[in-house]
Amino acid sequence: MIISILACTSAGGIGNKGTLPWPKNSEDLKWFKEHTTGQIVVMGRNTWDDKMMPKPLPNRTNCVVSNRLIDNINVRRLKGNIKQEVLNLQAQFPDKNVFIIGGKTIYEHTQDIVEIVYLTRMLKSWGADTKVNLERLLMNHRIKTVKPGTDCTYETWVRQT
């Protein structure tokens, strides 16, 4: 299954100056870890380069979309057609979920093949210089569950058939 997982502001803000717009949120990090551990994570080069992110993410197959070499033997580099690369991963590892974890360009290029979106919506306003179009990202999906968090809500969206 191909799944997008992201946290954003109500305006779709996902990044500010190369990192998350809000301070570390342990509750959201736990949610992310619970869903992605043991699975495949696909990210863009800017997400990989975020200083706040451990490299590689432990107990996951890390894949980075980049035309440049990745200086880490524990990472698989993807290049070319992002959507096709993700579909290839799904075919290669049918027993695993492929999680799209950012950034903006990776979400945009894969939104047509994503079956589930795990969306953490931050309740406070945070300045962001990178935003996703939530309306477009969630198009053809319907909300399945909403769980309240401390400073956020956890939403699960599923593709309509």
Predicted segment positions?
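Enzymes that bind and transform nitrogen-containing heteroaromatic metabolites
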Residues: 1-161
